[in-house]
């Protein structure tokens, strides 16, 4: 995303950069720059967004093909030219369109070091809103392509445009074997000294300390994990110089070397101006050399979609290079370089340079210092914390799509090596899976998942997501489930759209619903299915009748939903049956009269709750289960809104613990999809003719609060109606089903929409003494946040928005002082939001945003007219217990059971159906323990017997007394009970033989171990390990 240079305006009037660096650095007695020739490594590159102000198809056809055609042609003709390429989605698309002759030429360019791949992912993924599994997916796509086509293993990260660097990226890149990492967008007050404003104390510490390069130790959980990191000192465009306008001191002028840009600011090099242009270039190099602890400079040469006219760029720069290199008095030597050449040079310096360390710290919130803001507010005041939430429906759809992709990956991988005697064509499934992978990778792009692209581009992203999900839902999942459950016949009648079946049923009909569990833990949890209003009963996979409940949801267009608990084996499938009963509760299907007596679904009538002026402050509405209650009261100060008021901890016999939750509303000052800038403090969202409903039943209890036609909240509490895990064996010591249950949390289903210049947030208020400390996660690790005033910026909007941080899926506040009854409030989400604690005891999640302000780069307002359902899970109570269960609950919440439906013909007795088709598929010998998560089980290539398997120990150091410890796991036997003597490779998989195991880097492009067929591994807290498994079916 770009990147109009004049809009940065790090003007010398504002940043007295030259003076500061000369005064503060040249006098540093440890400087290694003095009296040395400056070695300039010019990095030719083109930053190619996968959509932004145009769609990626438009960018590809109009720009990228031109760039690659011309650059490759130039490199072929001139071996002195070099180029660095990042976005592999574009490169692979282009590559597949080339002749075998040109492909051979390109391979030569790669082999001789002229064409160099940096990063190597599908995209430069966003770091503030993207889930780590999606990051791994998109990096694996790119890395596998580079490995298969060129034998290339990338080793340098190139994240030059994402809006703030996360520790997650540095951690994952380290696990991929990267040695070096280049970043760019950090708070510009970290980079530059603003000494015209004495109130910005401490600005420019990277300049003062010459710390634009540092050793980054990103993980609190692995102190040995590190990556050498370089911060671009002046963005990723070609060199430029900004200087005061002598005729107008309120303006500045820019001159530079972006030869495809405005020629008045970037004049072509000729004989008449070469001395002047060389002097400017050398001046820039001399200034920038003062920022580093050595005399080598990494200088980007390019910009957004540059090098469409490759000869123009190279020809002009050739003249400068020749002229400057031929005159040693300049003290500068320049060379075209690939990124690795720069880092290899820096690494070879003797004696080694000492660098600063950054430990466990990310670099959010990004702030761009625009001249207009600086002149208006005397500070930057441009906090990019808005994009953590912007366009939540897009973020939700992308996360749901990734969950669906995971289901498809698991089913495809399990099906390919499953022997049941039936022929099956896997080509269609692999095509659908490949497309879904590609779309998942595209959506990680830093202008896609962020919601920062133009509207029609965002629509294009939705179209991609819908097409990918449709293929997976219409073909992959139904077909693979039918294949895996086939016994005496191949079941091809499944479909993912249950409404088409359920809405056409008649009394006596029986619908089979098969639920796929993509997580390697046994699961028992409540599901809901939209149904027509009919009498029903539910049977499990063994035809046992089970309790169910029918609820009318007034917050969901008054539709009816069926709730019941489902048990599924780890990574497996369970089939449940819905029987349509007569009006008097009888089974009318003559072929199914042998079914046990049904338990008719309980019809729970939702009673409307009406405010009564005679109600006193003690009048309470309560929903609950055996663990806790939620208590609600009418709020006379907010139009008599029914409001959460307190919590009863029944397990610890603590009654009436204060907790409330309100929807609040900010008014925009000049918000856009990137930045969050509001007028002031929020106010409670005022309901218009509110309605309230209470639903009580054996499976679920609900309080529904309807603010208006497009805004509501429903609180749901589930009861545990299943007393044991049917899949546990005598040898299973994990006892997973008893640790994680869905009666441990309450759910809030927010259905929200914003008016113009309004932003809606959900705010929890408790008596937790969090001392302005709160926690959000980067998807993998919890990050400690501290509410504070940054850079002495006391504008009210800055105090608010500078303290919002990305919450990928988890956030919480906790009592900071030990007491007899410490409390913790934990919020789990299925998508990223901005989150904060603005006041002691409060936790806030920004849900949806809309603004009429026209953003300068996309030239559109943030006009989000969606009305999404945004669900969160809430865990309240003891911190030790909350931290023990929050991570497994988060994984399960993000990866729901995936149903497929089939109408059983009335002519087939139910007994014959379950004899023809299995009702259970159990691929693992036993459920994994809750601290061991099967992150990936993917057959990446259609013609390979290998599976990429990733395992992660999901608990952090100190998170849980019981689970924050190392795990021993025998991939051959599946034994996680420290039994290292089992050499009989029965496999932890039930239906599959494992003939070879190789440990690899995270993106599976480098081997870390020799092949074996039985491997005992140890995973420390939060450690990820990746393996290639060679599988074959058990006969």
Swiss-Prot record:
Any one GO cellular component localisation term in the record: lysosome
Positions of Zn(2+) binding: 47, 49, 161, 446
Entry EC number(s): 3.2.1.24
UniProt entry keywords in alphabetical sequence: Glycoprotein, Glycosidase, Hydrolase, Metal-binding, Secreted, Signal, Zinc
Signal peptide start-end: 1-20
InterPro entries to which the protein is assigned, alphabetical: Gal_mutarotase_sf_dom, Glyco_hydro/deAcase_b/a-brl, Glyco_hydro_38_C, Glyco_hydro_38_cen, Glyco_hydro_38_cen_sf, Glyco_hydro_38_N, Glyco_hydro_38_N_sf, Glyco_hydro_57/38_cen_sf
Free-text cofactor note: Binds 1 zinc ion per subunit.
Biological-process GO terms, alphabetical: mannose metabolic process
Subcellular location: Secreted
Reported cofactor(s): Zn(2+)
Cited Pfam families: Alpha-mann_mid, Glyco_hydro_38C, Glyco_hydro_38N
Keyword Zinc annotated: yes
Glycosylation sites: 19, 30, 63, 245, 250, 270, 309, 327, 438, 487, 497, 503, 710, 719, 735, 792, 852, 863, 880, 962, 993
Active site: 161 (nucleophile)
Source organism superkingdom: Eukaryota
GO molecular function, one term: alpha-mannosidase activity
Reactions that this protein is recorded to catalyse: Hydrolysis of terminal, non-reducing alpha-D-mannose residues in alpha-D-mannosides
Family recorded in the similarity comment: Belongs to the glycosyl hydrolase 38 family.
Xref: PANTHER family: ALPHA-MANNOSIDASE, ALPHA-MANNOSIDASE B
Protein name: Alpha-mannosidase B
Lineage of the organism: Eukaryota, Amoebozoa, Evosea, Eumycetozoa, Dictyostelia
């Amino acid at each position: 995303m770009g990147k109009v240079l004049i809009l940065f305006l790090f003007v010398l009037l504002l940043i007295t950069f030259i003076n500061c660096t000369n005064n503060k650095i040249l006098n540093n007695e440890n400087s290694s720059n003095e009296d040395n020739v400056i070695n300039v490594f010019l990095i030719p590159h083109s930053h190619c967004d996968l959509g932004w102000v145009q769609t990626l198809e438009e960018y590809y056809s109009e720009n990228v093909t031109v760039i690659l055609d011309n650059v490759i042609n130039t490199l072929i003709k001139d071996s002195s030219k070099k180029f660095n390429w990042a976005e592999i989605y574009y490169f692979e698309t282009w590559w597949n369109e080339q002749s075998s002759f040109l492909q051979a030429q390109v391979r030569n360019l790669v082999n001789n070091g002229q064409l160099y791949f940096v990063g190597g992912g599908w995209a430069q993924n966003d770091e503030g809103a993207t889930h780590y599994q999606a990051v791994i997916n998109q990096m694996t796509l790119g890395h596998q392509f580079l490995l298969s086509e060129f034998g290339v293993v990338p080793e340098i990260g190139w994240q030059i445009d994402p809006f703030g660097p996360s520790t997650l990226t540095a951690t994952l890149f380290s696990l991929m074997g990267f040695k070096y990492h280049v970043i760019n967008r950090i708070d510009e007050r970290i980079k530059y000294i603003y000494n015209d404003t004495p109130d910005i104390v401490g600005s420019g510490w990277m300049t003062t300390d010459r710390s634009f390069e540092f050793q980054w130790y990103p993980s609190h959980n692995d102190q040995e994990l590190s990556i050498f990191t370089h911060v671009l000192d002046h963005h990723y465009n070609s060199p430029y110089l900004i200087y005061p306008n002598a005729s107008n001191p309120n303006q500045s002028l820019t001159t530079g070397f972006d030869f495809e840009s405005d020629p008045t600011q970037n004049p072509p090099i000729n004989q008449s101006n070469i001395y002047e242009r060389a002097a400017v270039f050398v001046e820039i190099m001399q200034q920038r050399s003062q920022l580093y602890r050595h005399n080598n400079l990494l200088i980007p040469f390019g910009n957004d979609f540059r090098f469409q006219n490759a000869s123009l760029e190279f020809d002009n720069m050739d003249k400068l290079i020749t002229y400057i290199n031929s005159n040693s008095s300049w003290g500068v030597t320049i060379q075209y370089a690939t990124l690795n050449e720069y880092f290899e040079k820096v690494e070879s310096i003797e004696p080694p340079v000492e660098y600063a360390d950054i430990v466990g710290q990310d670099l959010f919130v990004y702030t761009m210092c625009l001249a207009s803001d600086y002149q208006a507010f005397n500070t930057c005041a441009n906090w990019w914390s808005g994009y953590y939430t912007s366009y939540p429906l897009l973020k939700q759809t992308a996360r749901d799509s990734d969950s669906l992709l995971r289901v498809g990956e698991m089913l495809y991988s399990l099906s390919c090596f499953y022997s049941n005697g039936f022929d099956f064509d896997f080509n269609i499934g692999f095509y659908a899976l490949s497309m879904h992978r590609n779309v998942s990778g595209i959506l990680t792009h830093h202008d896609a998942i962020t919601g920062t692209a133009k509207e029609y581009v965002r629509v294009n992203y939705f179209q991609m997501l819908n097409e990918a999900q449709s293929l997976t839902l219409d073909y992959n999942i139904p077909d693979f489930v039918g294949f895996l459950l086939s016994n005496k016949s191949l079941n091809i009648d499944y479909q993912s759209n249950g409404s088409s079946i359920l809405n056409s049923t008649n009394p006596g009909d029986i619908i089979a619903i098969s639920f796929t569990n993509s997580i390697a833990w046994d699961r028992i949890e409540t599901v809901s299915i939209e149904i027509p209003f009919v009498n029903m009963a539910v049977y499990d996979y063994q035809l046992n009748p089970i309790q169910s409940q029918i609820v009318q949801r007034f917050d969901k267009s008054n539709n009816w939903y069926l709730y019941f608990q489902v048990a599924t084996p780890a990574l497996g499938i369970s089939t449940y049956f819905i029987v349509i009963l007569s009006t008097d509760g009888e089974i009318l299907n003559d072929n199914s009269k042998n079914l046990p007596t049904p338990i008719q679904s309980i019809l729970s009538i939702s009673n409307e709750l009406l405010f009564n002026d005679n109600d006193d402050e003690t009048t309470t509405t309560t929903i609950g289960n055996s663990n806790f209650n939620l208590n609600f009261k009418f709020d006379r100060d907010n139009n008599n809104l029914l409001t959460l008021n307190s919590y009863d901890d029944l397990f610890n016999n603590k009654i009436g613990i204060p907790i409330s939750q309100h929807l609040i509303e900010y008014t925009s000052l000049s918000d856009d999809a990137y930045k969050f800038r509001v007028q002031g403090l929020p106010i409670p969202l005022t309901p218009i003719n509110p309605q309230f409903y209470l639903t009580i039943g054996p499976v679920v209890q609900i309080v529904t609060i309807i603010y208006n036609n497009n805004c509501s909240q429903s609180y749901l509490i589930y009861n545990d109606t299943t007393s044991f895990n049917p899949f546990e064996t005598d040898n299973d010591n994990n006892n997973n089903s008893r640790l994680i249950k869905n009666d441990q949390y309450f759910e809030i289903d927010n259905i929200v929409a914003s008016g113009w210049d309004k932003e809606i947030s959900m705010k929890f208020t408790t008596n937790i003494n969090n001392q302005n400390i709160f926690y959000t996660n980067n998807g993998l690790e919890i990050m400690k946040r501290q509410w504070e005033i940054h850079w002495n910026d006391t504008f009210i909007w800055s105090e608010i928005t500078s303290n919002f941080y990305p919450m990928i899926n988890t956030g919480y506040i906790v009592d900071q002082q030990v007491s007899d009854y410490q409390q913790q409030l934990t919020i789990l989400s299925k998508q990223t939001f901005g989150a904060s604690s603005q006041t002691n005891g409060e936790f806030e999640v920004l849900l949806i945003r809309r603004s009429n302000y026209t953003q300068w780069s996309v030239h559109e307002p943030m006009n989000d007219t969606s009305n999404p359902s945004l669900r969160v899970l809430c865990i309240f109570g003891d911190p030790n217990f909350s931290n023990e269960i929050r991570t497994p609950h988060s994984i399960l919440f993000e990866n729901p059971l995936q149903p497929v439906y089939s109408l059983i013909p009335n002519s087939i007795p139910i007994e014959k159906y379950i004899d023809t088709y299995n009702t259970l598929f159990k691929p693992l010998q036993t459920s994994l323990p809750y601290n061991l998560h099967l992150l990936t089980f993917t057959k990446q290539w259609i013609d390979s017997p290998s599976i990429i398997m990733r395992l992660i120990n999901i608990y952090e150091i100190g998170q849980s007394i019981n689970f924050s410890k190392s795990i021993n796991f025998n991939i051959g036997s599946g034994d996680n009970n420290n039994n290292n003597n089992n050499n009989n490779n029965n496999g932890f998989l039930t239906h599959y033989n494992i003939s070879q195991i190789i440990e690899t880097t995270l993106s599976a492009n480098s081997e870390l171990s020799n092949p074996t067929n039985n491997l005992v591994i140890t995973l420390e807290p939060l450690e990820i390990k990746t393996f290639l498994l060679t599988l074959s079916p058990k006969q």
